[in-house]
């Protein structure tokens, strides 16, 4: 551990302007709306807004496992969110204020439920459908340990 006690973290972290590189706008360290754009909504109860990235694919695979297991309430519409700036649209930021994919909206609840971050979506769906999530506390702890591990690990 450093013995330098002179460093004081800033009260508010500020992002230094991007360097203009090719990928500088897709994963900026800020979030929030940059433009107005509504998101499409399909006919199924679950609306998935994502892209075929490792985190996006996790949710799609789980939804397909639910459907293969006969959980018809897991029908969903998938919408492509290109990470070229679309994730900063007003519609997407309303669902995920962090401006990251994936995000899910469940229209079966009294008010639509928004869920963002792949691990949160996986846990939400597992609990909603009582699928692949043990009820036994020890087994559940083991399951959640692996879920959280994969979230923090590189693909």
PLM regions: where:
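GST-like domain detector, emphasizing the conserved glutathione-binding G-site
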Residues: 1-155
């Amino acid at each position: 551990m450093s013995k330098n006690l002179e460093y004081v973290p800033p009260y508010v972290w500020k992002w230094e302007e991007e360097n203009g590189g090719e990928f500088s706008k897709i994963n900026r360290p800020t979030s929030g709306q940059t433009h107005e754009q509504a998101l499409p909504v399909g006919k199924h109860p679950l609306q998935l807004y994502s892209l075929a990235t490792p985190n996006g694919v996790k949710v799609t695979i789980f939804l397909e496992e639910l459907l293969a297991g006969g959980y018809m309430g897991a029908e969903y519409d998938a919408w492509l969110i290109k990470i070229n700036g679309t994730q900063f649209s007003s519609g997407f930021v309303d669902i995920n204020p962090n401006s990251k994919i994936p995000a899910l909206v469940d229209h079966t609840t009294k008010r639509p439920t928004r869920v963002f971050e792949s691990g949160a979506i996986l846990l939400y769906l597992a609990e909603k459908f009582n699928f692949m999530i043990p009820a036994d506390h020890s087994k559940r702890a083991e399951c959640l340990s692996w879920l959280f591990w994969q979230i923090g690990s590189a693909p």
